[in-house]
Every structure is written in structure tokens, then in C-alpha cells.
Curated annotation (Swiss-Prot):
Protein name: Acireductone dioxygenase
UniProt cofactor(s): Fe(2+); Ni(2+)
UniProt subunit comment: Monomer.
Keywords: Amino-acid biosynthesis, Dioxygenase, Iron, Metal-binding, Methionine biosynthesis, Nickel, Oxidoreductase
Gene giving rise to this polypeptide: mtnD
Length: 180
């Protein structure tokens, strides 16, 4: 089940607010300019689906985002617990960073933890199957896929080259709870 935990950016040991209610999560995130919606990831894709099959199954949803926001490209990221690069890839995005464009993810299966650093608070968003999250450009954040990642998500871009991580150098992410 999706979840949101809000912390002060000075007190990682004490949550200020928590919820697993999608409507409450959406209200909290909308207030800070972050899009969170529950979509239906109900297509049968089989085990270890190929990216083209995932795109084809959810083309209608992708087209909706493209029509709304003018995004120009999309792809699929899939991570499994047996991926030999899982530790390197996890570590890469566990440090606070920004992107020059929105970070849009639709979770088709599995889960991941997005942590946003806004307004002197940390917003930890547990995204699971059916969750659409759009983090605005230039928002300081980090992502934890867990020690045994198991997810498939559609990523939507303005420009894939613009999606380069710009690390802030802030070690704040080291102080907050991880996915596992």
C-alpha cells in the first residue's frame, strides 16, 4: 500500500505526519506542487516483461501524459533482486540530487521510495503498483529501490538527456529511513 511520511529536515527520528490513504497523500503532495495519482496497472504482462510489451500495454496512459504536459519520450525501467548492478544502481540515486525536468514515474509493479526535500521538510513517498508520481524539475530528492529491488515503472521525459542527475552534495539522505 502506498504511503507518505513527512519529517522535519532537522529531525529524521520523529515523523510529523504519516498516512497510507491515497486521497490524503494526494492532498499533501498537491499542496507542494507534486502530482500523485492512483492509476490502474491491471494489464497482464507475465514474468520479466519486455519494455516494448509494457509500453504497448500502457500506451493510452502515456498518451494522456504526453497530451497534458507535452512530454516527448518514455521508456521502462525494470529492476529485479538478481540484477548484478543492483547495489551500484541503488547507491547512485541514494544521494540528494535534482533533474532539469520533471521526474515522472508510473509504477506498473513493485515499489520504490522517493524522498523529496522541500520547505524544510522531507516527504517520503512509498510508491507501489498503480502509483503515478511526478516530481517537479529542480526538486531536491533521492530514490531508494531497496536492497532487493523488484519493480517495473514507466518513465516519461521532456528530453532523456535532460534527466541527468545533478547531485547537491548534501548528505541529508544518509539520516533518513531507507526502504528496507
Amino acid at each position: 500500500m502506498s504511503g507518505l511520511t513527512i519529517f522535519s529536515d532537522e529531525q529524521p527520528e520523529q515523523p510529523l505526519w504519516q498516512s497510507r490513504d491515497a486521497e490524503e497523500i494526494q492532498q499533501q503532495l498537491t499542496a507542494i506542487g507534486v502530482r500523485f495519482e492512483r492509476w490502474q496497472a491491471d494489464r497482464e504482462l507475465g514474468e520479466n516483461p519486455q519494455p516494448d510489451a509494457v509500453i504497448a500495454a500502457y500506451q493510452h496512459e502515456i498518451d494522456r501524459l504526453v497530451a497534458e504536459k507535452g512530454y516527448q519520450s518514455w521508456d521502462v525501467i525494470s529492476m529485479r533482486p538478481d540484477n548484478e548492478q543492483r547495489e551500484v544502481l541503488r547507491e547512485k540515486f541514494l544521494s540528494e540530487h535534482t533533474h532539469g525536468e520533471d521526474e515522472v514515474r508510473f509504477f506498473v509493479e513493485g515499489a520504490g521510495l522517493f524522498c523529496l526535500h522541500l520547505n524544510s521538510k522531507i516527504y517520503q513517498i512509498l510508491c507501489e503498483k498503480n502509483d503515478l508520481l511526478s516530481v517537479p524539475a529542480d526538486t531536491p530528492h533521492w530514490f531508494d529501490m531497496g536492497s532487493k529491488p523488484n519493480f517495473t515503472a514507466i518513465r516519461v521525459f521532456d528530453n532523456p538527456e535532460g534527466w541527468v542527475a545533478r547531485f547537491t552534495g548534501d548528505k541529508i539522505a544518509d539520516s533518513y529511513p531507507r526502504l528496507d
